[in-house]
From Swiss-Prot:
Ligand binding (Zn(2+)): C27, C208, H233, E237
Protein name per its UniProtKB record: Cysteine--tRNA ligase
NCBIfam families: cysS
Organism: Solidesulfovibrio magneticus (strain ATCC 700980 / DSM 13731 / RS-1)
Cofactor: Zn(2+)
Amino acid sequence: MQLYNTMTRTKEPFVSRVPGKVAMYVCGITAYDLCHIGHARSSVVFDVLVRYLRHIGFDVTFVRNFTDVDDKIIKKANAEGTTSQEIAERYIATFYEDMDKLGILRPNAEPKATEYIGEMASLAQRLIDSGHAYRTPSGDVYFRVRSFAGYGKLSGRDVEDMRSGARVAPGEEKEDPLDFALWKASKPGEPVWESPFGPGRPGWHLECSAMSEKLLGMPIDIHGGGQDLIFPHHENEIAQSEAAIGGEFCRYWVHNGFVRINTEKMSKSLGNFITIRDIYARYLPEVLRFFLLSSQYRSPLDYSDQGLDEAEKGIKRIYAAKVQMEQALGRAKWSETKLPADVTEELSRHEEGFTAAMDDDLNTAQAMGHVFGLVRLAGRLMEDKTLAKSRETAEVLGRILADFGVWAEVLGVFGTDATAFLADLKACRLTRLGIDAARVDGLVAERQDARKAKDFARSDAIRDELASLGVTVMDTPTGPQWDIA
């Protein structure tokens, strides 16, 4: 498997530090508000990475943190007249609700920053002792950026360029404008902990370094997050961790691309974000997950209702194909008709193609293409009146269903009961489009009566009325069935 390493700006063969084992850390949410679709993308990307690494045989220890002490949390708590802890607990709970519906597997460990204050203070003290950090008279602790020769290597930024125009804000006691906070001295209205440098709270960057070292050891194999974290957060993590341990902090840096709305990065700070719950109000969670897997994870993803509609159609095709294959395999008797040689070749090509796509920097978009390739292959076999009866067709369909079962575990989609999913999808679409199912059932029954009475003018009029609602009717041997176009 190859992964794109942000540090080297190239795809590299993935080789773990300890053979067969992977230590992986991903920056989690700052728990002060509902999660948006950008959080959903990052969660899905790294969930699939963990799933695939396990699929190909790695024992993955996955850690994802919660930032439960931060300026934004404190600001919200003060505005609501409550505590930072209450705010953090509230939004950690909503995070779990959203992510469980999205099919995100729970990590091996989910540390909260406030649970590791001692480790953070210890790390800051080590940096002070080694000359990489300093305590100010007011009790703040800053990291000396210029003391770390590799600063900027992840983001590709030059220290001198960053220094140009930078200023120390009034009231700050930094030696250099580039220095960043490891520990913030206590202030009224903020949570506080004791430390060797006096009462205060940790800086944001310190927590991930301390928790990853404590829970995973150094160096970790994979550190993940959104591209917005490359600078300053991950750059600062590298500086403080490598300055403290005197060696490599992380071997592979993996970052997912932004979600964009109207070509702009979506974020809370820009005020153009769409919460996950906004989407769940109109689409099934699995449709959102499918949509997020429709592009390569490093590429920008443009959000739109049209994109979700296309994802809905796509996942419906897969589930419908599963139902058709399961029904086809219920045949009591099979012929010995031989399949063309290219059928098994096509099947193998898509199976190998799926693996090759996932091995190529987790290219889920290309992998999905091979899923649909097997949907088309199954459709051709079932539609051919002669081949549909062949025992060899049954073997191919069984193999495709088995492939889908394995791939569903890897991707986290199309793995539930197909009939139940299609019923839920239909109900969701009816609600979103404002279509009354009872009215449709009545019109379909009325059309059926008209057909029996050979009143084809009335039957056609009802069909047109249904079409105006976006409903199509299929006449089957067991009676009419309808769906939303």
